[in-house]
Amino acid sequence: RWLGWQKFCWISCLFSSISSGLDPGEQAKVTTALDTAQFAINAINEEYIAQAKAIEEALKVSTQARSADLLRRQTELAKFGSKVGKALKAVQAASAIASFVFTFFMPSELDVITSLINERFNEVNAKLDRIDEKLDEMEKSIKADTAFNVFLSAWIKWEYKVRNGAKKLSDIRKAMGTKTQRIDQVKLAEEYVKYYETNNLDGNVLSLYRMAALPESITQRNIFDRFIAQFGCDITKLSELMILVQNIMTSAGQQKLTYYYFKGDQSRANSSFKDIQMYFFKIRQGFDDRVWHCRRNSLDYAKRDANKILKNMRGSSRESIVRAIFNELKVKYPWYTWAVAAVKSDRPRIRGLELRGSTYFRLEDRSDAKKVKGYFVVYEDTRSSASCSDITQAKTLLVFKKCDGCNSDYIYAADNILSKKRCGESTLERLVDFKQQCPVCHRWPYSITCYCANRVKQDSQNMGLYCISSQHH
């Protein structure tokens, strides 16, 4: 409330100083323009701070993080990518400042601009510049990935034109806040109009919209489709791309509306904002559709990525291959938790330990036809839970002999996927049906054949058996 009172006093002081030069209608227009800009800027500032934090967390993702934490971060970032309202508010804020310039500085009969008006104008303008700086910080963080940066440079060729236009507009606004003569304000506005036209910036908004929302004529892909084709269905990176597209679109939209206001064409500025609004919603729809596509087809993409790693790492140690596949799938597709293991082709013949369930897939390295190397990949919904005590109820159970020379590091499993490595030596033993496996021993318990049960126990504990189970529903 104190801030609101301070703001009221500021505006009151402002217009008591200039009331002799402005009629009530002009005063109302100036008040509306500045207040609209102030309101829009304040509304989006906190959102951009939260978005920057989400990006920072996403970029610090570690393979040591829990799957649930990875999923939370990715979901939060995707939500920010889908929120175009804040971008539209940023466009409106710049539009309101341009409207203020047109309404007061440009057609005003006052030759002298009071220092108090300039001070208020600079205050609002500085807040808008700080938001632009925050957008630049987010962009630099995202584009620290070299491959990401190369992709953007190839597909957003006019990005630098937009960035240069934003710098020019910022410089013009700052200069306006230092001038006390109306004619100087007019000259600055004319300078920007000429720059905008000379550099052909008017087509940037439409070009960006077409690239992001509409399929390209030959390949029938937009920028999100091309990104998925090159980087796979990584929703974290896809969300970062959407945020970059939003930021560029926001800047281009601010420049476009400012151009029309500085030209004195308020009607065209209003219609252009409606177009920009539609463009943002269409781009968001394209992004949301691709996120849904990635979620729906995540297992297919995971299989493709795992096979690609296996192909690229032929000749590497099996332990390093298992670790690479596990880390890739864990970070890229966190709505599933994963387990990966290197195995021998033969399985133990113990009743009760038969392969069951379907939430897994098998990879094979056939580079050596005489010695096929097998890998199991098991997955589970991250939101479900499992513990060692649940193993008898497991929906998917894989029990296999470890590969020759393997040690415990040849199995990597997420926190809520069970493995013998984590659940203790008696895990598999609890699943064996000893009456079926050793029927003679159970009919004649004092017979010498009773060594069977001990042998089965030893097999399940000491022969290098591993199990991966999933509670997938």
Curated annotation (Swiss-Prot):
Coiled-coil annotated spans: 40-60, 116-147
Presence of the UniProt keyword Transport in the record: no
Keyword tags: Coiled coil, Secreted, Signal
Location in the cell: Secreted
UniProt GO cellular component terms: extracellular region
Signal peptide positions (record): 1-21
InterPro entries in UniProt: SE-CTX-like
Expressed in which tissues: Component of the acid-insoluble and acid-soluble organic matrix of the aragonitic skeleton (at protein level).
Protein's name according to its UniProt entry: Cephalotoxin-like protein
